[in-house]
């Protein structure tokens, strides 16, 4: 079987998995409620803003920290968003595990050990 065929088969298996099915159900539920959708999108926007500032070494103001903490508290009280974020996290773990399996035995790039031997 060709590698691309295997990749397509893996994609189908993921799409039919319990994890993905649950994630999709929760996402659809969030997207069908404008208030919940807006709250999630605001949370994600603030999260990206703070992470971006951290990565770039910029200062996060007290106001930004407080605003983010407030929305995090609201998110934790909203079971739909909390379940969705948990499912999204589990999908991320699944993809990371699959990536480790796929690339774990491959020698791609130059290792630190190979760099030091001349």
From Swiss-Prot:
What family is reported? Belongs to the UPF0342 family.
Q: What is this protein called?
A: UPF0342 protein Hore_03100
Gene3D superfamilies named among the record's database cross-references: YheA/YmcA-like (1.20.1500.10)
An example of a Pfam family matching this protein is Com_YlbF
What is the superkingdom listed in this entry's lineage?
Answer: Bacteria
Could you tell me which InterPro entries the record lists for this protein? Com_YlbF, YheA/YmcA-like_dom_sf
Q: Which organism is it from?
A: Halothermothrix orenii (strain H 168 / OCM 544 / DSM 9562)
């Amino acid at each position: 079987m060709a590698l691309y065929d295997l990749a397509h088969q893996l994609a189908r298996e993921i799409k039919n998995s319990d994890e993905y099915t649950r994630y999709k159900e929760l996402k659809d539920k969030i997207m069908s409620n404008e208030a919940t959708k807006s709250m999630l999108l605001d949370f994600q926007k603030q999260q990206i803003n703070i992470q971006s500032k951290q990565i770039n070494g910029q200062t996060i103001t007290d106001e930004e920290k407080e605003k983010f903490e407030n929305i995090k508290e609201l998110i934790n009280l909203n079971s739909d968003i909390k379940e969705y974020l948990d499912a999204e996290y589990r999908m991320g773990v699944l993809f990371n595990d699959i990536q480790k399996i796929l690339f774990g035995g491959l020698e791609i790039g130059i290792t630190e050990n190979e760099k030091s031997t001349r």
